[in-house]
C-alpha cells in the first residue's frame, strides 16, 4: 500500500538553489523512493509567476512520487502541516550593505517564518535553514517558535562537510566514500573549522596518512572556508547545485539515518564542547530513527579550541546583533 504523502515546504522557491532542489525532492531523493511528497512552495508576490514556471516543469517531469504542489506567498499556507521545511530564501547581501543590516533584514524574514511554523506546521516538523547567515537565521526561527521543540531547528553545514570530504579525498588519494569521522565545527561562514583529527579512510587514520600540519592550517582550512567565494569568482554565480545537494544529504540522513556514520549539522547547543546553550553550532552527529545525536566526548586540543572559539565569537556577535529583534 502506498504511504501517505509527506508535506515538504520550500521557501525561495523561484531561486537558483530551489531550482536544483525541487526536482530531486520530487524524484524521491529527500525522503526515499517509496515516499510520495506534496511540495508547498513559498516566494514573494513578485516571484509567483516564476514559481508557476518551475511548477510547469515539475509537471512535465511526471514524477510518480509528486502527489501535489501548492504555490503561495503566505508562510501560513506554505507551512501548513509541513513535515519538512527547507528555508532556502533569505535576503542576499547587496553592494554596500553592512553585515548588521543583513542580519536585521533576515531577522525580519525568519521571525515571521518561525512564527508561522509555530502556528501551523506539524509538531514534528524538521526545519533546515539554508539561507545565510544560516546558523543565526535558524536561531531566529527557533526563538520565534516557542511551541515547537528546539531540536527541530537546524542549519546547513553539510556543504562545508562535503567540501572538506572532497579536499581530503584529493589530498589522500582515497575514495571520498571511504572517509569517515570528519567533523565541521561552528558557523556556516569562513570561520568554521573542518577537523579531520578523528577521520579515517578505509580504517586508516587520515591525520597519519596526510601528516602535514602546514597543509591543514594554511591550505585545507582556508580552502574549505572560502570555497563559496572561489566558485563565485570562477563561475560568476553562487554555488546553487552543490548547496541543494547538501540540503538533500542533510535531511535525507536526518530522516533515514546515517548507519552510525558521522555527518555535520548545525544544531541548538546543549552546552557541550563549551558552546553556550541554544547557539546553533555545527557539530558531528549520527542520525537514527528520525533523530540526530551529537557525537560526545571528543578531545579538543589547543588548536581546535582556538578555532572553535573563533567561530563561536562570530555566532555570539550575530546573536547579540539580533537580540533586540526577538521577543524571547
Curated annotation (Swiss-Prot):
The active site is at residue 188. One of its GO terms (biological process) is malate metabolic process. Keywords: NAD, Oxidoreductase, Tricarboxylic acid cycle. It catalyses: (S)-malate + NAD(+) = oxaloacetate + NADH + H(+). It is an enzyme of class 1 (oxidoreductase). Substrate binds at residues 93, 99, 132, 163. Belongs to the LDH/MDH superfamily. MDH type 2 family. Catalyzes the reversible oxidation of malate to oxaloacetate. This is Malate dehydrogenase. The lineage of its organism: Bacteria, Pseudomonadati, Pseudomonadota, Betaproteobacteria, Burkholderiales.
